[in-house]
Every structure is written in C-alpha cells, then in structure tokens.
C-alpha cells in the first residue's frame, strides 16, 4: 500500500525522529506508472478469464396444493443442467407427503443446493448472491401476502424480497380458487412491482391425456418466462383444418 504520493519529500519526518520507529519511511517512495499498468492489466485479465457462471434459479415450495408442479420443475431444470437452490417450507413438506409419493429429502436431491426455511442467513438471502430468478411453486396465499408487504419471516419470503429489491425476476405460481379481493389486490400490487403472477391454468388445446401432460405444459410455460426452453409440450401453431 502506498503511504505517500508518487515522489514524496520526507524532510519533515527526518527532523521529527519518526524514522526511529518506522525505518522504512526514510526511503523515497517511487511508483512506476508501468508497474501500475502491469498490475491493472493482470486484474483485468483475471476477470476476463473467469469461467462463466451457470444459469442459476432459486426454487421455493410452500404449503399450497400443487406441489407436483415444483417437483416436475426441479426435474426439468436438472435435465437442462440449470443450477437450482431449493427451499421447502414446513407446510410445503407436509403437503408433499399428502399429495405425492415423494419425501422431502428425495425432492431435495433434485436440487443443486438446499436450505432450511429457518436459515435466513443462507446465501440466497443476500442481494450479493447472484441468480437468474426465483420461482415460488406452488405459492400459498399466506406467502403471497407476506411477500407483498415485505414481511420476511423466513428464508422464502426473505429471498423473494431480495429478488424484488435487486430487480431480479420473481415468479409466483399462485394456487387458490376462488380468489378474494384481498388475494387479487395482493397480486396486483406485486405485479406492479414487476413480479410475475402465474396461476397454473392448463391449456386444453394440447389435448392432455394425463396429469403429467398438464404438468408439462405449466412447467414449460414457467420456464418460458426465464428464457429457458424446455421442449415439454406441443405449442400453439394456429388452427389447422383437418
């Protein structure tokens, strides 16, 4: 670290006896411009040669019905080699056991990294942690309300709050019907803040033959919002005469 400008007159220090305690200060400090240029060049080269960061998505599963959507989303993202960071709420885990044959630890194995919903110190709770978006699937009305007012009581709502403040993409797969005016106002407020509200409404033009077909279409449309192409369902090509 340079203590003085490029070339410093240090007569004052010689007369005060400071060099008795700091002998190195008795030398004239000279910094070569070529040295600074070389050091800056090394730093730029190091930054430019850093490996590119993989596509990274934060996924949260809350306690609304439709947990199969979250599971299928994780499966597809893994197939596409997308890095995933997963948080499952207490009631998300309970709903998972009730609606599917999956156990939370099996679903966690689909993700690149998982976190406890209580661990608000996890990396995804910080704006300095870079990611390409967050998906809450399914998103309960409780989670929707908490995110809308910035009530960050757990890691899911904190990570969502950070995504909003950092202007990163946040998509909520809201699962409830019918919707009250409170639900709709919460959705409208978040939509105005740039959040994507994604009710998993199935498309029947695909002629779904099973629950799996319905999941494929919804998951594919979710990923469309993040610029991730998943060839999981037939896309609309206009009405064709038979």
Curated annotation (Swiss-Prot):
Q: Keywords in UniProt for this one? A: Flavoprotein, FMN, Mitochondrion, Prenyltransferase, RNA-binding, Transferase, Transit peptide
Q: Which domain of life is it from?
A: Eukaryota
- Its primary localisation, in coarse terms, equals mitochondrion
Question: Which residues constitute the organelle targeting sequence?
Answer: 1-58
What subcellular compartments does it reside in?
Answer: Mitochondrion
Q: Which GO terms describe its biological process?
A: catabolic process; cellular response to oxidative stress; cinnamic acid catabolic process
Leading EC class: transferase
Note the InterPro entries from the entry: Flavin_trans-like, Flavoprotein, UbiX-like
Q: A single GO CC term, please?
A: mitochondrion
Q: Could you give the subunit structure recorded for this chain?
A: Oligomer.
Q: What else is known?
A: Present with 1750 molecules/cell in log phase SD medium.
Q: Which family does it belong to?
A: Belongs to the UbiX/PAD1 family.
The name of this protein is Flavin prenyltransferase PAD1, mitochondrial
Tell me the organism's taxonomic lineage: Eukaryota, Fungi, Dikarya, Ascomycota, Saccharomycotina
């Amino acid at each position: 670290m340079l203590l003085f400008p490029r070339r410093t007159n240090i007569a004052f220090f010689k007369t005060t006896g400071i060099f008795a305690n700091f002998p190195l200060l008795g030398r004239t400090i000279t910094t070569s411009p070529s040295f600074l240029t070389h050091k800056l060049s090394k730093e730029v080269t190091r930054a430019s040669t850093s490996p590119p960061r993989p596509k990274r998505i934060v996924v949260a599963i809350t306690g609304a019905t439709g947990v199969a959507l979250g599971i299928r989303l994780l499966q597809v993202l893994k197939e596409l080699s997308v890095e995933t960071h997963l948080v499952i709420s207490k009631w998300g885990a309970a709903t998972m056991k009730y609606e599917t044959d999956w156990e939370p630890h099996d679903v966690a194995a689909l993700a690149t990294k998982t976190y406890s919903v209580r661990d608000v110190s996890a990396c995804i709770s910080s704006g300095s942690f870079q990611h390409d978006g967050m998906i809450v699937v399914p998103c309960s009305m409780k989670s929707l309300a908490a995110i809308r007012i910035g009530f960050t009581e757990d890691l899911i709502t904190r990570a969502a709050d950070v995504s909003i403040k950092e202007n990163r993409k946040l998509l909520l797969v809201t699962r409830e019907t019918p919707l009250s005016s409170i639900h709709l106002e919460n959705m409208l407020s978040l939509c105005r803040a740039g959040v994507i509200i994604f009710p998993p409404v199935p498309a029947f033009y695909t002629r779904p033959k099973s629950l799996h077909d319905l999941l494929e279409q919804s998951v594919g449309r979710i990923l469309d919002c993040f610029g991730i192409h998943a060839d999981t369902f037939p896309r609309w090509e206009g009405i064709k005469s038979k």
